[in-house]
C-alpha cells in the first residue's frame, strides 16, 4: 500500500502505522480533558497520530492528531511530501479555469490532468460498511460516543471532525462542510455553522422554498482522509468535494444513500448521524475554546435532531481539539498553504509566494511576495487576495513584499516593513468587511476592518525621493574569504 492508494480511514491508519506515524495508546485515558492534554503535547513535538484504544467509560476507540504534521496532511491528499501539494494546487487551478489544448503537444502535456478527471464521478453503492450497525428511534444515544471535552470551561462535549452533508432545495450537488456540534442530549446537537458557509446557505434556501418543513442533514464521522480534506480545500464551485476526493485518492469516491433521507454519505465512514433541523429550533452554543486561543461568546444556532446512528463494526471515533496555535487546524493551514499558491498564481502570475503563518490562527494574516511591475501594483494584489478565494474573506492583515523577501522568514518581512513602508502612505484600511464570528476584537460580530501593508520598494509616482539601494556583497571578495575561511579557524 502506498500513499496514493488507500481506500478508507482504516487503510490509511495501516499506512501510518507501517511508517511509524501512528501510536496506539492502551492505557485508559479520559475523553474529558485528558486526551486533549496528551494530543496537544504530542502535536507540539511533531509526534504521531494517536489511537486511544481504551477511553475511560467508552467501548469505542478515539483517533486524534490524525493531521498533526504537514507530512500526514500530504499523505492524506495522496502525496509523499508537502512540496508535492503544489501539484494539487495546479490541478485545482486547472479545474477552476480549464483551458482547451492549443495543439497536439499541449494535449499530450495535459493528458495526466484529463486522466485524473476520470476519477471524479462518485460510485453509488446499495449497501455499505457505514451501515453495518443501525440504531434508530429510542435506541439513538449520542452519549455512547466518546465525544471529547477539550478545555476546562467548555460548555459540553463537542463533536469536532463531523463532515456535515446538506443539499439546497434547488441544487443537484451536495455540500460538505466541517462544523462543530455541541452535545445537548441523547439525540440532540447544536449545529454551529456561520451564515456564509455552504450548509447554512443550503438551510436558508430550504426555509425560503419549503417554509416549516424539516431540513435533512447527515454527518459523517471517520471518513477517509481525502474526503475530509476535500471539505477544507478551495475546490471550484463547479466541483463537488466527493469528486475532488476521488482525484486525490486516485479512485472514485464510494457513497451510499442514507436510510432516512436522500443525502449520500461516504460509504466507508466509521459513523453516520442522520436527522433533521426543525425550522425555528435554536439553542445557545458555547462557550468553547477555539483556534484563536480564547473562549468564544455564546450565540444561538440551529438544533440538529438525530434520528439514526449507523456505523461500522468496531467503529473508531475521529476527533480533535482547537486551541492557540499550533493545533491541528494550524497544521492543516501550513499544508494547504502549498495548495493555495498555484491557484493564486494562475490569477495573479506576478505572485512569487504566499504564506499564512500558523501563529496568525491559520488565515488571519497573509504574507505575499511578488514581482512588482508598476506603481500601485501591491495594492491590486492585496485586494485580489481578499476577493479571489472565499477562504481569505476573513484574512485581517495582508502584507505585500517584493520577491527579494522570503515570505516565510519574519526577519525578512519585518525588515521590509520597517525600511520600505511609510505608515500613512502604505497602509490600506478597509472598514465594514466580513470578519470571523469568533473574532471578538471586531467592533460588531461578523463585521470588522482589514489592513493591507505595502512593504514593497516604491516606484515613481509612489514617492518623490531617491529610493535606497540594498547592500550587496562583492562576490569576488566572498569567494576569496570562502577559500581561506577554515584556515582562519575563528570558531575553533
UniProtKB/Swiss-Prot annotation:
UniProt membrane topology term: Peripheral membrane protein
Pathway: Cofactor biosynthesis; ubiquinone biosynthesis
GO terms for cellular component: cytosol; plasma membrane
SUPFAM superfamilies cross-referenced by the UniProt entry: FMN-binding split barrel, UbiD C-terminal domain-like
Subcellular location: Cell membrane
Active site, UniProt feature: 290 (proton donor)
Binding site for Mn(2+): 175, 241
Molecular functions (GO terms): 3-octaprenyl-4-hydroxybenzoate carboxy-lyase activity; metal ion binding
UniProt keywords, alphabetically: Cell membrane, Decarboxylase, Flavoprotein, FMN, Lyase, Manganese, Membrane, Metal-binding, Ubiquinone biosynthesis
Enzyme class: lyase
Quaternary structure annotation from Swiss-Prot or TrEMBL: Homohexamer.
Family membership: Belongs to the UbiD family.
PANTHER family to which the protein is assigned, alphabetical: 3-OCTAPRENYL-4-HYDROXYBENZOATE CARBOXY-LYASE-RELATED, FERULIC ACID DECARBOXYLASE 1
Protein name listed in UniProt: 3-octaprenyl-4-hydroxybenzoate carboxy-lyase
Source organism: Salmonella typhi
